[in-house]
A protein has these predicted regions:
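Extended, low-hydrophobicity, Ser/Thr/Pro/Gly-biased non-transmembrane segments
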Residues: 218-330
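A surface-exposed beta-strand-loop module
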Residues: 168-169, 177-238, 284
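Asparagine-centered strand-capping/turn motif at beta-strand->loop junctions
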Residues: 160-165
Length: 359
C-alpha cells in the first residue's frame, strides 16, 4: 500500500521501516491495538477454565486481519489500469473503505469494553471510600449455604454481629460482590430495610456498645471480578501476566471463576457479606485490624465434583458441611474434578488435590 502511494521505492522502504519500528514500540502500550503479531494478548488455553478473554483475542485478531485486508484492497485500487477499467478502481476503494470501517468498529468495541471496566472499578472505589469511615461491627459467627447453577450462585447467610466499640452506632455496612443481588434481609421475623450502592449494603439499625444482632440474608447472581483488588492501578489491572521463563505466552487474569467443571472463590471477590473490605482504597484510611469469625460452609449439590474449603468436611445426603472448629480470618471455596492423595504421619494428615491426569 505504501509503495502504491509513493512511487519512489527507496523512500517507500525507509517509510515502511519507520512504520514497523513505531508499531513494535507501541505494541502493548494502549490496549494492544498496535500488537499486530499478538505477543501481548492472552494466548494460553487452559484445560480447566478454557480460554479467558477469548472474545478480546478474537476481536483483536479480526481487527488486524481487517486492517491488512483493507490495505491490500486499497493498494490494488492504486495500481495503474487500462482506461476502460475505471469502474474496478471504484469497487476496490469501496471494498477497502468497508474493511477499514469494520476494523474501526472493532477497535471502538475494544476501547469501550476496557474503559467500561475501568469506569466500573472507579465507581466501586468511590463507593468504598464513601463508606470506609463508617463504624465497623464484628461478625462473630457466619453460617453460609451455597448452591450453584451454571455460573450463577444462590446463597444464604446467617450472621451474628457484635458492636465491640465504645460508642453506639446507628448505621453499619456490609461489603458484598456487586454481581450478587440481595433478595431478602431479615432480623428474626422482621424484614430489614437496606440501601445498596455498588458493593455496599448499608443498614440503618442502631446497635449499642456491646450489643449483638442476628441477621439472615438471601442473595444470588453472578460474580463480578471487577471488584477484586481495587487498590491495584488500572494499567496493572489491564495487563496480562507473562509466562515464566520469558516465553511469548500471556495469561489472562482471572480473580474468580464459577462454572460446571470448576469453581474458585476467594475472599478478594467478596462472595459472601463481610463488614470489613478486603483492601483499602483511600490513603486517608488506615487498614483496620483483622477480624476472626467462626465460619461454617454448606455446599449443596456438586455430587460429581470434589469441593475444597477450610475445615473438616462432613458429607450429608446432597451437601457437604465444612467446619474448621475455630475462628478464621476469611473463607475460600474451590470445586473441580480433583483427585485426593493423602498421607498420615504421626497423627498429622497431609493432603494434596490435583486434577485427574495432571499429577
Amino acid at each position: 500500500f505504501i509503495k502504491s502511494l509513493i512511487r519512489i521505492q527507496g523512500i517507500a522502504l525507509i517509510l515502511l521501516i519507520g512504520i514497523f519500528s513505531i508499531l513494535f514500540y507501541l505494541s502493548g502500550k494502549e490496549l494492544w491495538i498496535f500488537d499486530f503479531m499478538g505477543h501481548y494478548i492472552p494466548n494460553v488455553f487452559s484445560e480447566v477454565t478454557g480460554g479467558r478473554e477469548q472474545g478480546f483475542f478474537l476481536v483483536q485478531r479480526l481487527y488486524i486481519f481487517l486492517v491488512g485486508l483493507s490495505l491490500c484492497t486499497l493498494s490494488v485500487a492504486n495500481m495503474e489500469r487500462l482506461p476502460n477499467w475505471n469502474y474496478c478502481h471504484r469497487k476496490m476503494y469501496v471494498a477497502g473503505g468497508i474493511f477499514g470501517g469494520l476494523a474501526l468498529l472493532a477497535v471502538i468495541g475494544v476501547f469501550c469494553s476496557f474503559h467500561e471496566n475501568i469506569k466500573t472499578r472507579s465507581f466501586y472505589s468511590a463507593c468504598q471510600e464513601k463508606y470506609e469511615k463508617t463504624p465497623e461491627v464484628r461478625v462473630v459467627s457466619h453460617d453460609i449455604e451455597l448452591r450453584r447453577a451454571g455460573d450463577s450462585l444462590y446463597m444464604k447467610s446467617h450472621l451474628v454481629l457484635v458492636n465491640e466499640g465504645k460508642y453506639p452506632c446507628s448505621t453499619f455496612t456490609f461489603y458484598l460482590n456487586p454481581g450478587l443481588r440481595v433478595d431478602s434481609l431479615w432480623e428474626g421475623c422482621q424484614q430489614v430495610a437496606f440501601l445498596r450502592e455498588g458493593q455496599i449494603l448499608s443498614i440503618d439499625r442502631r446497635l449499642c456498645a456491646g450489643d449483638s444482632v442476628s441477621l439472615q440474608l438471601e442473595y444470588s447472581g453472578k460474580i463480578d471480578e471487577r471488584i477484586c483488588y481495587l487498590d491495584v492501578a488500572d494499567d496493572v489491572y489491564s495487563s496480562f501476566k507473562v509466562f515464566p521463563g520469558g516465553l511469548p505466552y500471556r495469561f489472562a487474569r482471572c480473580y474468580a471463576y464459577v462454572g460446571d467443571d470448576f469453581m474458585l472463590l476467594t475472599p478478594e471477590s467478596i462472595w459472601y457479606p463481610v463488614t470489613s473490605p478486603p483492601v483499602v482504597t483511600s490513603r486517608d484510611v488506615v487498614m483496620r485490624g483483622m477480624y476472626f469469625t467462626r465460619y461454617t460452609l454448606r455446599v449443596v449439590g456438586e455430587k460429581d465434583r470434589v469441593v475444597i474449603s477450610q475445615g473438616k468436611c462432613l458429607r450429608e445426603k446432597d451437601s457437604r458441611l465444612f467446619d474448621a472448629g475455630h475462628a478464621l480470618p476469611a473463607l475460600s471455596v474451590c470445586m473441580g474434578n480433583y483427585e485426593r492423595k493423602y498421607l498420615k504421619d504421626a497423627g498429622t494428615l497431609y493432603e494434596i488435590y490435583c486434577f485427574k491426569g495432571h499429577d
